[in-house]
Every structure is written in structure tokens, then in C-alpha cells.
From Swiss-Prot:
Lineage, top ranks: Bacteria, Pseudomonadati, Chlorobiota, Chlorobiia, Chlorobiales
Protein purpose: Negative regulator of class I heat shock genes (grpE-dnaK-dnaJ and groELS operons). Prevents heat-shock induction of these operons.
Sorted UniProt keywords: Repressor, Stress response, Transcription, Transcription regulation
Gene field: hrcA
GO BP annotations, alphabetical order: negative regulation of DNA-templated transcription
Name of this chain's protein: Heat-inducible transcription repressor HrcA
Matching Gene3D superfamilies: 3.30.450.40, Heat-inducible transcription repressor hrca homolog, domain 3, Winged helix-like DNA-binding domain superfamily/Winged helix DNA-binding domain
A Gene Ontology molecular function term of the record: DNA binding
Family affiliation: Belongs to the HrcA family.
């Protein structure tokens, strides 16, 4: 879509309207701008500029209000060409660092770190926050352990690069001993260590074809490769927090709006689709990762046009997870972008320290 080039005056007025609307949640009038901002322009001149912005589709007049509010087009222009993203402030940085520091890097439950990240992100942004753990199919296999639960039942524990762990209970159609399990575990770790789960899943039969160690248990592992070494369900990869903050926003002052929001939060498959889609990259953020923003109906996975989604990836070895903030289009974009960006940096660093 071609971007309309606004004049410097129009850009300044549009930026003021959006910034004022983010704070007040009330339509912004020309009189308010003339009174509170030293633009050197009369009320009438500002009103004419706002009329031009409205004609071009950047702002609109809600009902009979004397003020104007931004449209999706206005928000998009602001994010792409007006917004200035500065570094994270000291209080925000301390809040994130102190919470992630609670988790030692040798702890074997990365889910605690990811849920803590979601809670902190929701608290700072005052929006709904989502952390999606990395896709494990590209994760590097470190080791496998088995726990004998009964003579025909075992627990298989897969340790994947950077503390990610997958646990599955398997029912066997044969009896096994602890000694048999130890021999199979040693063999699997020797043959499979350093491969990705995808590589193991597609080649495990060939890699174990010449082995004569306990064929019964080995064959059961090979037959279960799709279950053992496949991707975790997306519902198990989502950590959601911040619902208590987003419902306090003026946009959710009606019961039906709250019900719609709750339905969306409970539909994790839908949340995953919304978060996992790449939006428009924010050009002002120059990092190793892209921070992207989808506004309203730009995200085809969102049935409502009332939300903005800010997302960025974080990295764990050669795998990638995602962070996201979902909130009303009337959000402090610059603040959310810098917080999401810093949180992704810290998560990537936290997990890389393990390797």
C-alpha cells in the first residue's frame, strides 16, 4: 500500500493526536492542541490541518464528539514514520533483570523462566503478554533418560539444548529390567547426541539398524519416534499473563467486550496463530531481531479489528521462540516496543548462558 506523504505540520499534529489519545482515551480537539502544545498555530489553523488528516483517512470523528481519534491508517503512519523508540529506562530494566535473575541457569525447568517473563512483560506494558517457547524440532538433543515406573511402563525424559525438557510416559508391550534400560539409554545417547529432533525423528531407524542391544525396547523406541521426537503441542508452548491489566483499559468497560476478550484468551490455538504471524517490521529498532507490529485487521488471524500485536523473536541456540504484547490499538507503542525488545535480549542471554 502506497504511503501518503504528509507535510511536517500534518505529521506533528497527527503525532500529538495519537500521543494525547493514548494518555486520555478521549477524542482530541483542535482547541486542546492549541491550548496544551506550543505549535505557534491558531485553533482555526489546527482545525484545518485536522480536516485534511481526516479527509486522508488518518483520523476520524467518533459520533458527535468535537475531537478526533486515530484510525488504523493513522496508527500505521505513526509507527512507521513518526514514532521515536528510545532505550529502556532504568526502572523497567531493573524490573525485568531482577525477576529473571531469580532463576538459576542450572534449573531444569525453563517453563518457570518463560512464565516469569510473561508476567513481567504484562506488568510493565499493562497489556496482555504472551511468551511462546521455541519449536523443539530444531532443538539439539543433549541426552535421554528413562525411569522405570513398572516392568512394562517407563518415563522417557529428553533433555534439549538450553534446559528445555520433554517428558513422555510410555506403555510397553514387553517387560524390561533396569539393566536393559541402562544399556538402551547409553546406546541412544551415544548415537543421537548432537542431532536435532527433526534429524532423529527421520533417521533413527537407520542410525540404530546395526545395533544388537535389546531389540525389543529399541524397536519400541523407533516405532515411537514420531511421538518422542516430534514438536510439542502449541498449547503447551504458550505462557500468557496480564489479563488483569488489559481488562482495566477503557476499551473494555462493557461486559460484552470483556467476554470477547476472555474467549480470545481461552482459545490458545487462536492466540498462537496471532502471535506467530510476522507483522510489519518497526524500522526504528535496529537490532539483530525484527520487532514487528500488526494493527487491527492487519493480522489475518485476529477476527476483531480492535487489537494491536507487537512481537519479536528470542533465540535459544538454533531455535527461536516469540514474545508478544496484545492490547488495544490505543497503546504506548514506543514503550511497548522497547520493553519487548529488551525482554527478548534478556531471555536470549539467559538461555545462551546455559550452553
Amino acid at each position: 500500500m502506497k504511503t501518503i506523504d504528509l507535510t511536517p505540520r500534518e505529521r506533528e499534529v497527527l503525532g500529538i493526536i495519537i500521543q494525547a489519545y493514548v494518555v486520555s482515551a478521549s477524542p482530541v480537539s483542535s482547541r486542546f492542541i492549541a491550548k496544551n502544545y506550543n505549535l505557534g498555530l491558531s485553533d482555526a489553523t489546527i482545525r484545518n490541518v485536522m480536516a485534511d488528516l481526516e479527509d486522508a483517512g488518518f483520523i476520524s470523528q467518533p459520533h458527535t464528539s468535537a475531537g478526533r481519534v486515530p484510525t488504523d491508517k493513522g496508527y500505521r503512519y505513526y509507527v512507521d514514520l513518526i514514532m521515536m523508540v528510545q532505550g529502556i529506562d532504568d526502572d523497567e530494566k531493573r524490573h525485568i533483570d531482577s525477576n529473571l535473575r531469580l532463576f538459576t541457569i542450572d534449573r531444569k525447568d525453563s517453563s518457570e523462566v518463560l512464565f516469569a517473563a510473561a508476567k513481567v512483560l504484562g506488568s510493565i506494558s499493562q497489556q496482555l503478554s504472551v511468551v511462546m517457547s521455541p519449536r523443539l524440532s530444531l532443538g539439539v538433543f543433549e541426552r535421554l533418560d528413562m525411569v522405570l515406573l513398572s516392568s512394562s511402563r517407563i518415563m522417557v525424559i529428553l533433555s534439549i539444548q538450553s534446559l528445555f525438557v520433554k517428558t513422555i510416559v510410555m506403555e510397553l508391550d514387553l517387560d524390561v529390567s533396569r539393566r536393559q534400560i541402562e544399556m538402551v539409554v547409553d546406546l541412544l545417547n551415544q548415537r543421537l547426541s548432537g542431532l536435532t529432533l527433526d534429524e532423529i525423528r527421520t533417521s533413527i531407524a537407520e542410525r540404530l539398524a546395526d545395533c544388537d542391544t535389546d531389540q525389543g525396547l529399541l524397536n519400541r523406541i523407533v516405532r515411537s519416534a514420531d511421538e518422542l521426537f516430534d514438536e510439542s503441542p502449541v498449547l503447551d508452548r504458550l505462557y500468557i499473563a496480564g489479563a488483569e491489566y488489559i481488562v482495566s483499559q477503557p476499551e473494555f468497560d462493557q461486559p460484552q467486550k470483556v467476554r470477547d476478550l476472555i474467549c480470545m484468551i481461552e482459545d490458545k490455538t487462536r492466540i498462537a496463530r496471532i502471535v506467530d504471524l510476522d507483522g510489519v517490521v518497526v524500522p526504528q529498532v535496529m537490532t539483530e531481531r525484527d520487532v514487528s507490529i500488526t494493527i487491527g485487521r492487519e493480522n489475518p488471524a485476529s477476527t476483531e479489528g480492535d487489537f494491536t500485536v507487537v512481537t519479536t523473536p528470542y533465540f535459544v541456540g538454533n531455535t527461536m521462540g516469540r514474545l508478544a504484547v496484545l492490547g488495544p490499538k490505543r497503546m504506548d507503542y514506543a514503550r511497548v516496543v522497547r520493553v519487548v525488545n529488551y525482554m527478548a535480549d534478556r531471555l536470549s542471554t539467559t538461555f545462551s548462558d546455559v550452553n
